[in-house]
Amino acid sequence: MVKSTDGGGGSSSSSSVAPFLRKCYDMVDDSTTDSIISWSPSADNSFVILDTTVFSVQLLPKYFKHSNFSSFIRQLNIYGFRKVDADRWEFANDGFVRGQKDLLKNVIRRKNVQSSEQSKHESTSTTYAQEKSGLWKEVDILKGDKQVLAQELIKVRQYQEVTDTKMLHLEDRVQGMEESQQEMLSFLVMVMKNPSLLVQLLQPKEKNTWRKAGEGAKIVEEVTDEGESNSYGLPLVTYQPPSDNNGTAKSNSNDVNDFLRNADMLKFCLDENHVPLIIPDLYDDGAWEKLLLLSPSRKKTKKQENIVKKGKDDLTLEEEEEDGTMELDKSYMLKLISEEMEKPDDFEFGQLTPERSRNLEILTEQMELLASNE
């Protein structure tokens, strides 16, 4: 009776033990496999795996029908086995004791392991989904920024095209201004070198004609628009500038004449409503020539180069003094001529008084004399 009771109790206790634990205990307790796996010599509640390769090839297929060593280790962790030594495959459990197989019923499988792994996996999936959603939002924001930048780039390109067009127009205007400045400087240099040229240009050509008064000068009658002839009894004097051998002054006079006619300068000089033309007393120190040479759009002519070269090489101290005196006379004569032209007589219609006619004749002869002395 007692024997049967013990047997029944043993069978009931063994039936409550998990198959993995029972097989693992038999494998460790087998003395024939002590070279592969055995009880730990330092403790009764632990065992050590000595040869993992042979253990995976021979013992695992024999007891568990697989040869996966990692799966065996994972099963040990599920049942609460812990690794004792980090350098060896030694595992211990308080219910896994040598010679006390009945204590295996105290070893309980941990159920929260699978749930924790599952929850960990779920949390990982949730985190990944959140990160993915955040990345997609950033992509959408970047797309919007790209569209805004594209529109701004189009506006900048349009503004650049408009600016380039304005710059081209501005360059054309600046070039025209430089050309006009160059023409004006050329004219001023020409007048400073030949003051008689200005007197010739200021004489009206259409209604009044001046000629040199000499012996036997004839009195010319001026015919008005109504066909009436007005005789003033005055000699008509025309000013003839001194002719150079090379004929340079004549060609320059024609060019300047055309320039002044195009610019309506003659009308401006003879109009009483405008400010009177005043020719200042200036010394010929070569400033106009220097300014002309420094002009950005300057086109040098042979005459200008010869003048500059002559002024640098051949001008002596005595010549400078003489030139200064002559230029003072020129400036003074130009001033007198301008004052005579500004007097409120009916100069435009040729009604000159004898006194003014004589003054102009004297001034003209003096200007001719100064021009011939050059």
Curated annotation (Swiss-Prot):
Entries under Gene3D superfamilies matching the protein: Winged helix-like DNA-binding domain superfamily/Winged helix DNA-binding domain
Residue window of motif Nuclear export signal: 363-370
Chain intervals for the UniProt region annotation (Hydrophobic repeat HR-A/B): 126-192
Motif AHA1: chain residues: 285-294
Positions occupied by motif AHA2: 330-339
Location within or outside the cell: Cytoplasm; Nucleus
Any one GO molecular-function label of the UniProt entry: transcription cis-regulatory region binding
Subunit structure: Homotrimer.
Sequence similarity: Belongs to the HSF family. Class A subfamily.
Domain notes: The hydrophobic-rich region (HR-A/B) corresponds to the oligomerization domain. AHA motifs are transcriptional activator elements.
Protein name (record): Heat stress transcription factor A-8
Organism per entry: Arabidopsis thaliana (Mouse-ear cress)
